[in-house]
């Protein structure tokens, strides 16, 4: 049985609880997770806060499509994608991606694929608060290059 959890919202999440849910399937020998956090700097400037916005409904649909594409490429068990929105502070967790599979190679590849596609294809917008004022975060070419490998 394949299970997917996709959550987009302002609430914090527990990495431990998410891992426990993923690891509960005895059929899977591999659990791979990634947790992204707000950094206190970007582009050489101090970052005081990060505001994430999304397009409700469209964002969840895009994430579901990314997970479906990963499932079509690798034999996966459970998949979790959580992305926070709203105002966050340095050190806060932003995103969690977790995947399970019978073997590590599929789990690692699928986790990277989901994260690379999330960064380039899911409709999220970031605004940083810096000492010099607020600014929108532009898409990075390096993220596009990583997504192209798939």
From Swiss-Prot:
Coiled coil stretches, renumbered: none
Residues binding substrate, per UniProt: 37-39, 103-104, 119, 126-128
Gene Ontology biological process: Mo-molybdopterin cofactor biosynthetic process
Signal peptide range in chain numbering: none
One Gene Ontology term of the molecular function aspect: molybdopterin synthase activity
Pathways per UniProt: Cofactor biosynthesis; molybdopterin biosynthesis
Keyword Ligase assigned: no
GO cellular component: cytosol
Transmembrane segments: none
Entry EC no(s): 2.8.1.12
Top-level EC class: transferase
Reaction catalyzed: 2 [molybdopterin-synthase sulfur-carrier protein]-C-terminal-Gly-aminoethanethioate + cyclic pyranopterin phosphate + H2O = molybdopterin + 2 [molybdopterin-synthase sulfur-carrier protein]-C-terminal Gly-Gly + 2 H(+)
Domain of life from the UniProt record: Bacteria
Alphabetically ordered keywords of this record: Molybdenum cofactor biosynthesis, Transferase
Subunit structure: Heterotetramer of 2 MoaD subunits and 2 MoaE subunits. Also stable as homodimer. The enzyme changes between these two forms during catalysis.
Functional summary from the UniProt entry: Converts molybdopterin precursor Z into molybdopterin. This requires the incorporation of two sulfur atoms into precursor Z to generate a dithiolene group. The sulfur is provided by MoaD.
Family: Belongs to the MoaE family.
Protein name: Molybdopterin synthase catalytic subunit
Gene: moaE
């Amino acid at each position: 049985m394949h299970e997917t959890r996709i959550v987009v919202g302002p609430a914090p999440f527990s990495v431990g609880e998410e891992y426990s849910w993923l690891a509960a399937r005895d059929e899977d020998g591999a659990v791979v997770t990634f947790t992204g956090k707000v950094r206190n700097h970007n582009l050489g400037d101090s970052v005081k806060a990060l505001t994430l916005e999304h397009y409700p409904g469209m964002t969840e649909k895009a994430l579901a499509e990314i997970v479906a594409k990963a499932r079509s490429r690798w034999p996966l068990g459970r998949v979790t994608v959580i992305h926070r929105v709203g105002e966050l502070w340095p050190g806060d967790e932003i995103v969690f991606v977790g995947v399970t599979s019978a073997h590590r190679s599929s789990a690692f590849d699928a986790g990277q694929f989901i994260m690379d596609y999330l960064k380039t294809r899911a409709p999220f917008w970031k605004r940083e608060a810096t000492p010099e004022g607020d600014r929108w975060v532009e898409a990075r070419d390096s993220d596009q290059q990583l997504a192209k490998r798939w």
